[in-house]
Amino acid sequence: MSGIDQKRIRNFCIIAHIDHGKSTLADRIIEKTGLLTSREMSSQVLDNMDLERERGITIKAQTVRTVYKAKDGEEYIFNLIDTPGHVDFNYEVSRSLAACEGAILVVDAAQGIEAQTLANVYLALDHNLDVFPVINKIDLPSADPQRVIAEIEDVIGIEAQDAPLISAKNGINIEEVLEQIVSKIPAPKGDKNAPLQALIFDSIYDSYKGVIIFCRVMEGTVKKGTTLKMMATGATADVVELGIFGPGQFIPAEELSAGMVGYITASLKNVKDTRVGDTVTDAENPCKTPLPGYKKVNPMVYCGMYPADGAKYPDLRDALEKLQLNDASLQFEPETSIALGFGFRCGFLGLLHLEIIQERLEREYNLDLVTTAPSVIYKVYKTNGEMLEITNPSNLPDPSEIEHMEEPMVKAEIMVTTEFVGAIMTLCQERRGIYLGMEYMESTRALLRYELPLNEIIYDFFDALKSRSRGYASFDYEMKGYVPSELVKLDILINKEEVDALSFIVHGESAYERGRRMCEKLKDEIPRHLFEIPIQAAVGSKVIARETVKAMRKDVLAKCYGGDISRKRKLLEKQKEGKKRMRQIGNVEIPQKAFMSVLKLDED
C-alpha cells in the first residue's frame, strides 16, 4: 500500500443529468477493470439502496477503487466517486467534486444537454476540475451524436470532437473512456510528509464500527492510532481502522497518504461530529488552515410528520434518530398539533429529500405517517424590531404585531423545447416568477431564467412543469436570498374549529384561489356525518371561501301517510333541533386522506 506512486492515481467522478446513464457507466468501468465479474455484477452496483434502484437516482455518494492496466503497460488506480445528481443534494455534489481532479461528463446522445447537466458542469469548472465529455446511448435509434457534440461546444465551451461515443448499456467503446481517464485527468498533487489535511466528502454510521468517514487525503499521511481532529466541529478521536473501497465492502490498509481516497473509522458515535466538507487533521501536528468550501447545510423545507397511530410516537422518534445518524442534514424537533396529536417538525434540503425520508420511514420502519403541507423558512419582522424565523404557520405572531415578512427566492434555470416555451412562461408567471432572460441553445431548445419564490416551487412545481411540457422540460435552481412579500396565514376551519395542521402561509393574491380549492377538495374527502359540516377558509377573522358537507338524514315523515302539514312540520322541526344540538357537540372525523389530498391541489 505504502509504495503507491502518486502519478498513477486518478480521482474522478461522473456527472450527468438524471437518466443519462451515469450509474450504468460506473457499472461498466467496474466490470471492464475486472473488479467484479459479469456474474457478480448487479445493475447500478453503486446504488445500493432499494429506493435508489427503483427511482433510478443516486442519493448517497458512493465510492469505489479499481485498478486498470493501461495500453502503456502501467497499472493505474482509479478512485471513482459517484455523486448524487439531484439539486437537493447540491452541497454533497460540490464536496464530492472537491475530492477529485477530474470529471467525466456523460451526455445522452438523444436528449443532449439538460439543466441539471449544466448546473453540475459549472460546479465542476468552479472547482477547477478537468472535464471531458462522453456521449452515451449511441445505440438508440434517435441518437444524434454530432448535434450533441456541437451543443456541448457551444453551450459549455469544452472541446468535444474526440469525445468517446459509447453505449454503457451494451458495453461499446468503454476502453476508450478508460484510456481518456488516464490521459486527460491529472494525477493528484500533495506532499506525503506535510501535516495531515483531508477532506470529508461523506460519512455513514455503522452499528458496529460507529461513524465511518469517507475522505480524500490532500496532504500528509494518516495511520492507525493517529489522533484526528475535525477542524469545523472540534471533535477529536483516535483512528481505529482505515482502508480503501471495494464495491460494497471496505478493504483495510496500513496507511492513507496524499492523493488517496479511503475510509477511516475512529471511536466516534455521532455523524454530526463529521460534517461533509470538514477538514480532518492530526491533533498533534495540525495543518495551518482548513480546506476551503465548508459550510453548514441548513434545511430549506420543513413539514410536520405525525404517526397515524398515536401510540407509534416513540417508534417514529427512534426511526428519525437512526436516519439522522446517516444524514446530518435531516433535522427534527417534537411538536404537538390539536388535530394530529404528537409528532415532529422535520427540516429537509428539498422536496426530493422529504419524499425519500418519508418513503424510508414507511418502508424500512413500517410506519404509517400523516405529513402536513411543506413550508419554507419565513423571516418575520415585528413592530418592536424583533426578527423571527418561522417554519410552522401556527407560530406566526398576531398580524397587528408584524411590520413585514420576507420569503426566500431561488434563481431557476429551465431547459425546454421551443414549442413549450409559452406554456412554461405562463406557469412561471402563475407562480409569481420574475423573468430574467432566455437563450436559444439551438433551433429546437431554449434555456429560460427566472427568479421564483421557493414557497411556490416546493409544492408541485416540478409535476406541473413536466405535465405542461409533456415531460421535456428540465429544471435546476439555486438559492438567491430573501425579499419582502405580502404574505398571509390561511386557516382552514372545519365545523367552526380551526385545524392547525391544515394552515399555511400563502401570498395575499393567491389566498382566495387556494382557499377555495382547499375547501372543494376537503368537501370531497370528508365523509358525511349526521349533521352538516361547514368547511371554511379564513384569513384572520375574514372568511374568504366556504363549502358545506350536507348531513345524512333519516326520513322522519315515512310513517305519516297523508295527514295534516302541521304534523309533518312538527317532526321536521324536531329533527332540525336535534341536528343543531348534535352539531354543537359532535366531533368531525377527518380521514388521513384529506390531509394528503391538500398537498396535491394542482393535479386536477
Curated annotation (Swiss-Prot):
Indicate the segments annotated as coiled coil, or none if absent.
none
Name the catalysed reactions.
GTP + H2O = GDP + phosphate + H(+)
- List the Gene Ontology MF annotations in alphabetical order: GTP binding; GTPase activity; ribosome binding; translation elongation factor activity
Q: Where in the cell is it found?
A: Cell membrane
Sorted alphabetically, which InterPro entries does this protein's record hold? EF-4, EFG_III/V, EFG_V-like, EFTu-like_2, G_TR_CS, LepA_C_sf, LepA_CTD, LepA_IV
User: What biological-process terms (Gene Ontology) are attached?
Assistant: positive regulation of translation
Task: Name the EC number(s).
Answer: 3.6.5.n1
User: Main site of residence?
Assistant: membrane
Which UniProt keyword terms apply here? Cell membrane, GTP-binding, Hydrolase, Membrane, Nucleotide-binding, Protein biosynthesis
* Residues bound to GTP: D19, H20, G21, K22, S23, T24, N136, K137, I138, D139
Q: How does it sit in the membrane?
A: Peripheral membrane protein
Q: Which residues form the tr-type G domain?
A: 7-189
Residues annotated as transmembrane: none
Q: Name one GO cellular component term.
A: plasma membrane
Query: What family is this protein classified in?
Result: Belongs to the TRAFAC class translation factor GTPase superfamily. Classic translation factor GTPase family. LepA subfamily.
Per the entry, what this protein does is: Required for accurate and efficient protein synthesis under certain stress conditions. May act as a fidelity factor of the translation reaction, by catalyzing a one-codon backward translocation of tRNAs on improperly translocated ribosomes. Back-translocation proceeds from a post-translocation (POST) complex to a pre-translocation (PRE) complex, thus giving elongation factor G a second chance to translocate the tRNAs correctly. Binds to ribosomes in a GTP-dependent manner.
**Full protein name:** Elongation factor 4
Natural source organism:
Lachnoclostridium phytofermentans (strain ATCC 700394 / DSM 18823 / ISDg)
The gene behind this protein is: lepA
